[in-house]
């Protein structure tokens, strides 16, 4: 296990999803690095594939802790195939709609689940993840303005990556080993 928690009881199914989440975070670093070395549609596939895996594992963790372990497993089983397929569709025909639906529909699904379900067991901090994801997207959107306002010190795109890293740390912080 990448993550062993002595203070919060983590089920085996949640532990599997959490470990896959950590692996996908590593894959994001590799995919993003590959893309930034040679920005083109081919290398972007690897960046986006890793992102779809992160979305998958976040939604599976949410279902696991807020609905049921079985629901978490079914979410994982379905999205592990469907999520990467959204990138392959985009790569094949240029249609980014399925990927956008996964990304932004997933955010809506997280928000609705947080609002409409009770906490069944301790889990990661989904609220901070959503907030920081929104802030990261804003940083990306205002990339050039941030770069100019910072007197060419940092771009919005770079800030997006730093905020995303912070989001992961805060997301898992309720599960930390003390």
Regions found by a protein language model. Name each.
Residues 1-178:
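Multi-pass alpha-helical transmembrane bundles in non-GPCR membrane proteins
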């Amino acid at each position: 296990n990448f993550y062993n928690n002595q203070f919060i009881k983590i089920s085996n199914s949640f532990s599997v999803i959490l470990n896959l989440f950590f692996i996908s975070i590593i894959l994001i670093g590799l995919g993003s690095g590959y893309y930034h070395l040679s920005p083109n549609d081919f290398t972007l596939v690897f960046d986006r594939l890793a992102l779809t895996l992160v979305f998958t594992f976040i939604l599976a963790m949410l279902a696991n802790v807020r609905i049921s372990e079985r629901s978490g497993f079914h979410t994982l089983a379905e999205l592990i195939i469907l999520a990467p397929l959204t990138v392959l569709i985009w790569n094949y025909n240029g249609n980014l709609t399925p990927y956008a639906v996964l990304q932004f529909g997933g955010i809506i699904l997280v928000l609705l689940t947080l609002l409409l379900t009770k906490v069944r067991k301790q889990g990661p901090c989904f609220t901070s993840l959503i907030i920081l994801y929104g802030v990261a997207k804003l940083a990306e959107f205002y990339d050039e303005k941030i770069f100019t306002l910072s007197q060419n010190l940092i771009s919005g795109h770079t800030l997006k990556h730093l905020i995303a890293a912070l989001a992961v740390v805060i997301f898992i912080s309720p599960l930390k080993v003390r």
